[in-house]
């Protein structure tokens, strides 16, 4: 073997000396290379200046421990060459504490002499502690050598990881909850049974001047024609959302005795109207079940007369709180969207008067509901 590099170094040197200058000489960007060569001496000069400043810096006078440890450290380093400097410092500290005052006295006197000499040499000296270099500490924190429990500043990397994990967990939990929830606007107003009947098909029984009480509600065919015509597209959602409420209301209405309609009448006219309305909606055959839940017109008239007489006497006004039943109301009819039912006393036929605003409102709602689906 003639050479350790098998002759490759000679070829590289030839190529570097011949071919590279020929190729790079054609371009102008090769000229500033000389600038980098000029920077090297300046860098060396800067390091030399820093060294001279470090050497010219005035050092503090040594104390008694430093005077004793100066020679003792060298001796321990020779005896234990494998020990780190930190371990040597720990051993020196323990040894210094174990020494007696008589043994420490010569080192204390030497430290006092050095202090007096330092004052004489540098009368204007003022101790200025050097700033701690943060470069190494920051580098160690980035590398993760320092534990986060002892050094709060080293929690940067850990916090980033923890924040990312928490964000992922919260984001996944939110997505899971959003996937389980129904579409937006599904539960708006579904707390009550008659949400879709609220504006259009809720009857309002008015006391006519000729009659002395409330008129009986119309037949169920008219209810179905009014209620289901506006909201036929929402029936699947309504059945799913209002099944428990309807079952509860059906149970309440079925438990009311049929032979005593005064029980629901004397409490409040609104309770009577709601019970009659729920019983109508719960039954599918209007003609077969109308007579069971609605008493005859004469009996209703008698009940209404008794109720109005008691209201005029003022016996029930102090005992009944009218606002108590507001929390049980399942619908809130609007004043301008009411359907007024009246009875012709001569013919006994029902007549309905739809307000003009009802027709326009119904058309708008049907259009927006269809577009919203």
Curated annotation (Swiss-Prot):
Would you tell me the Gene Ontology cellular component terms?
nucleus
The impact of changing residue 93 to R is: No effect on ctnnb1-binding
A molecular-function term among this protein's GO annotations? beta-catenin binding
The segment(s) forming the Sox C-terminal domain are 256-373
Q: Which SMART domains has this protein been placed in?
A: HMG (SM00398)
Q: Provide the residue ranges listed under DNA-binding region in this record.
A: 58-126
Q: Which domain of life is it from?
A: Eukaryota
Question: Main site of residence?
Answer: nucleus
Q: Domain text from the record?
A: The 9aaTAD motif is a transactivation domain present in a large number of yeast and animal transcription factors.
> What is the stated purpose of this protein?
Transcription activator. Doesn't appear to bind to the consensus 5'-AACAAT-3' DNA binding site, but binds 5'-ATTGTT-3'. All of the sox17 proteins are required for embryonic endoderm development and gastrulation movements, and show some redundancy in function. In addition, the sox17 proteins have distinct but overlapping roles in later gut development. Acts downstream of vegt-signaling in endoderm differentiation to induce a range of endodermal genes both directly and indirectly. Also represses wnt-responsive genes to inhibit wnt/beta-catenin-mediated signaling.
Name of the protein described by the UniProt record = Transcription factor Sox-17-beta.1
Say which species the protein is native to.
Xenopus laevis
Per UniProt, what is the name of the gene that codes for the protein in this document?
sox17b.1
